[in-house]
Amino acid sequence: MINDIINDSKSRMEKSLGSLKTELAKLRTCRAHPSLLEHIKVDYYNVETPLSQVASIAIENPRTLSITPWEKNMVGPIEKAIQKADLGLNPATVGMVIRVPLPPLTEERRKELARVVREEAEHARVAIRNIRREANNDLKELMKEKEISEDEERRAQTAIQKLTDAQIAEVDKMASQKEADLMAV
C-alpha cells in the first residue's frame, strides 16, 4: 500500500521531468540539434504529421541542420511547415535536401529564452510538489483509517520528501544546463 503510493509518486514525478526535458528541447540554443524541428507538424497527404516521421533530420555543422525527406514531393510542405513554425528559421532547398541555417541569437533573445527556461523549470517544480502533497494526503487518509501506523506514515513521508528533493535537484540541474547553453556565445 505504502509502496504503491511511493512508486506512483515516483513515476508521476519522472513524467514531469520528461515533460520538462521535452519543453527545454524545443528551445533553440546556438547549436543545431534535431529536436529543434522534430515537433514541427507537416501536412502529409492532408494529415498533420511530425517532421521526424516524414524526413531524416541531421546536423550538418554546429549551426546548420539538414533535412532529407523520404519522398520527393514532401520538400515543399516541409519547407512551408518550418517557415510557419515561427522559429525565425529560413530553410534553403538544394535538390532533395533542405538546409536550415541557425542565425546567432541576440542578447535580448537569449535573456528571453533564459526566462522561459526558468518558468518551465518552476512549472515542473510545482508539479512535483503537488504530487508530493497528494501522496502525503493519501498517507494521512490511510493513517486515519488505521491501515498504517504513525511511524509508517512518517517513514513514507520521509521517503517521498527524499524523492521530491532528488527530482527538484534534477529539474534545477536541467534548467541551469539549458541556461548555460543559451548564454554561451
Swiss-Prot record:
Transmembrane feature ranges: none
Coiled coil: none
Chief location category: cytoplasm
Any one GO molecular function term: ribosomal large subunit binding
Subcellular location as annotated: Cytoplasm
Gene3D superfamilies per UniProt: 3.30.1360.40, Ribosome-recycling factor
Disulfide bond residue pairs: none
Keyword Cytoplasm: yes
Biological processes annotated in GO: cytoplasmic translational termination; translation
Keyword Kinase: no
SUPFAM superfamilies: Ribosome recycling factor, RRF
GO CC aspect terms: cytoplasm; cytosol
Keywords: Cytoplasm, Protein biosynthesis
InterPro entries referenced in this protein's UniProt entry, alphabetically: Ribosome_recyc_fac, Ribosome_recyc_fac_dom, RRF_sf
Pfam family, one: RRF
Family to which this protein belongs: Belongs to the RRF family.
Role played: Responsible for the release of ribosomes from messenger RNA at the termination of protein biosynthesis. May increase the efficiency of translation by recycling ribosomes from one round of translation to another.
Protein's name in the database: Ribosome-recycling factor
The species this protein was found in: Coxiella burnetii (strain RSA 493 / Nine Mile phase I)
Lineage, highest ranks first: Bacteria, Pseudomonadati, Pseudomonadota, Gammaproteobacteria, Legionellales
Gene coding for it: frr
